[in-house]
Amino acid sequence: MSTPRGSSAYVRGVVDVSIVVPACFENPLKEEAIDFLSAVLVQEVPAKIPVTAILGAYHIATRYIRAPREAVKNVLSSLLRTRSPAFFPDVSPYLAIEALRYAADFHIESWDGYLVALALFLGTNTIYSLDKELSRVSHVRVVIPFPEDKIREYHEYISALRHSPT
C-alpha cells in the first residue's frame, strides 16, 4: 500500500488555520504559535499542515485582523520555503467530497470538514485548533496546543483590535 502524497509513516494530527494565524503578526500568542509550528515543521510534532491553511491564514490575518499584508506574506512564505514534509499539498476530489459530507452532517464550515476528512484520511483523529466548533464531530479530538491563559489574552487582543477604529 502506498502512502498519500505529502504523508509520512506516522501522523499525530492536522494543523488548523487558527494555529497558523497567530504566527503572522504581533500578538500575545505569536511566540507559542511559532514554537508549535517550528516543532511541526521539523516533525518533532508529527503533524501535517495543509498548504491551504497557509493561504487561509493570509486571508484571515490581512482581511479580518488587518495585519500588514507584506509582513504576513513574508511570515507565511518563510514557512513554505522550509519545504518541510509537514506540508500536505493536495486537496483531492475525494477529500473535497468527504469535506462537504462532514460539513453538512455536522453543521460545520467546509474548511473544517476538510480538516476532519484529511485527519481521518491520514489515520489520525486529532486536529490542532483553537476552534472548539470542531468538537461537534464526535470522532475527532480537538487539541489546543497553547496555554489557556495565552489563548484568553489572544482572544481579548483580537477582540480589542476588531473593535478599534481603523
Where are each of the predicted segments found?
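Short active-site oxyanion
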Residues: 43-47, 85-87, 121-126
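Helix-adjacent hinge/juxtasegments
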Residues: 60-91
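Short loop/helix-cap segments at secondary-structure boundaries that form the rim of catalytic
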Residues: 134-140
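Acidic, metal-associated active-site segment
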Residues: 17, 109-126
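Short, well-structured N-terminal submotif of metal-dependent ribonuclease cores
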Residues: 1-49, 67-73, 151-166
